[in-house]
């Protein structure tokens, strides 16, 4: 009798644990990943191939990807950053996103072409509450800063762009933002 009670209690505890800890279970992602949070599938690789079709070198590929992202994704002013998560499929299906979405999409498209690219998180040097995400990409033997979300907004408004800013190395400090993470 005592043995049956112990088994019943153990099973009950196990079932409760599994019920309430479902989000803690290990889930194998089925995409291709090459960074801390940037994960993508074969559909993103196919899109990257289509964008870069006819490009002869890395520079042309980077600029083609940059142009595609800044012309086809719009800034989502209604996105609730309190519950931010990144999902390339959501960004592509809605054609909207915030800086985090723009940067991770650009990174996935570049990495699909075997182009070294990082996502950079940071905050404004004058306001720690003003968070931002942008990219660093390597082509033609140099690292460059670029900001696809900023440039998408500026293109839509017909204003001058941030563009590509040459860096000494991938982890060079930024003039406007304090870097908190590069991945």
Which residues fall in each region the model found?
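Hydrophobic alpha-helical segments and their boundary regions
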Residues: 10-12, 86, 130
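Sec-dependent signal peptide cleavage junction
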Residues: 20-35
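Secondary-structure boundary elements
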Residues: 31-93, 138-144, 174-183
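Hydrophobic/aromatic-rich core segments of domains that either
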Residues: 53, 67, 104-172, 183
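Active-site nucleophilic cysteine motif
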Residues: 61-65, 95-110
């Amino acid at each position: 009798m005592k043995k049956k009670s112990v088994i019943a209690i153990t099973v009950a505890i196990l079932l409760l644990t599994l019920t309430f800890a479902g989000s803690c279970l290990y889930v194998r992602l089925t995409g291709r990943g090459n960074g801390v949070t940037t994960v993508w599938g074969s559909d993103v690789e196919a899109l990257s191939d289509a964008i870069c079709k006819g490009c002869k070198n890395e520079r042309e590929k980077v600029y083609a990807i940059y142009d595609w992202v800044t012309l086809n994704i719009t800034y989502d002013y209604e996105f609730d950053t309190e519950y931010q998560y990144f999902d390339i499929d959501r960004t592509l299906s809605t054609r909207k996103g915030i800086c985090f979405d723009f940067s991770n999409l650009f990174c996935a498209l570049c990495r699909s072409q075997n182009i070294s690219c990082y996502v950079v998180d940071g905050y404004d040097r004058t306001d720690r509450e003003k968070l931002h995400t942008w990219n660093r990409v390597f082509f033609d033997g140099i690292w460059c800063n670029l900001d696809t979300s900023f440039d998408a907004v500026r293109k839509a408004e017909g204003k001058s762009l941030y563009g590509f800013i040459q860096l000494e190395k991938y982890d060079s400090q930024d003039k406007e933002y304090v870097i908190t993470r590069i991945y």
